[in-house]
């Protein structure tokens, strides 16, 4: 009937996003749901499927590196996944081409953030990004934290600037370490989009408000053009208002806007 035809047409019009998956990744279900709710057609894309050319990144408007423990965090969180890309010439070229296309976007969350931090040689405008190392607590931190969104060049946070929001962290190597020179460059270029804050709303490096000891509370960094974003916390785990630690009368989660902004970007 006509209604079914409309549904088929609408499905075809949805932008396609590749939810990347590698051995040990476990955050792909929530991430796929988050982007699907925002109006994307989410594809489960195993890295080997790209190597075997079952999928081509060119066919997608966005790619996401999800959370988990890729390759068991052997030799450092995210290292195995990143090296799989860097040491396969065809794969490296394909990702470099995608990262360079400013009409498309890339997102790395948690383990995905760790992966992107190790791919700076193929991500334009990421040369000043921080390194990620073991949490100051020297243990895995999995809980709610408070963050403040600041004005940046990342479209993901459009209209969210100034918001102080709870979010979930789950990592053992999330400390963003950076020297003063690179920090100043990132700040000048508006590449810093979110920071950890304490109970008074002040940016902090102190535990437990800052779960890992990141410099100046940094938790989210974008490329110079703004189309590539790496962040340690999980916005996809707070899509339902019932998942928030504090009861609210709001109908929708404020983190829904994060994913809706991605849809606006590709449109």
Model-derived features with residue positions:
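N-terminal beta1-alpha1 cap of cysteine-dependent amidohydrolase-like domains
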Residues: 1-109, 113-125, 133-142, 148, ...
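C-terminal and late-domain segments of enzyme folds
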Residues: 149-267
């Amino acid at each position: 009937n006509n209604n079914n035809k409309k549904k088929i047409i609408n499905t075809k019009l949805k932008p396609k996003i590749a939810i990347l998956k590698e051995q040990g990744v476990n955050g792909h279900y929530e991430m796929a749901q988050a982007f699907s709710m925002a109006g994307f057609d989410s594809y489960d894309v195993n890295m080997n499927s790209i190597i075997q050319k079952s999928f081509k990144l060119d066919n997608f408007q966005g790619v996401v590196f999800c959370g988990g423990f890729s390759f068991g965090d052997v030799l450092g969180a995210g290292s195995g996944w990143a090296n799989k890309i860097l040491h396969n010439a065809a794969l490296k070229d394909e990702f470099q081409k995608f990262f360079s296309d400013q009409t498309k976007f890339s997102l790395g969350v948690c383990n995905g953030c760790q992966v992107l931090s190790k791919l700076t040689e193929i991500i334009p405008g990421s040369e000043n990004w921080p390194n990620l190392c073991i949490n100051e607590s020297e243990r895995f931190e999995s809980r709610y934290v408070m963050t403040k969104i600041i004005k940046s060049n990342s479209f993901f946070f459009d209209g969210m600037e100034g918001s102080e929001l709870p979010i979930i962290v789950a990592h053992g190597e999330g400390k963003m370490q950076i020297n003063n020179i690179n920090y100043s460059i990132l700040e000048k270029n508006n590449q810093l989009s979110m920071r950890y804050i304490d109970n008074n709303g002040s940016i902090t490096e102190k535990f437990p408000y800052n779960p890992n000891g990141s410099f100046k509370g940094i938790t989210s960094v974008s490329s110079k053009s703004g189309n590539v974003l790496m962040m340690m916390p999980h916005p996809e785990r707070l899509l339902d208002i019932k998942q928030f630690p504090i009861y609210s009368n709001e109908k929708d989660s404020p983190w829904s806007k994060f994913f809706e902004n991605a849809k606006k970007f590709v449109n």
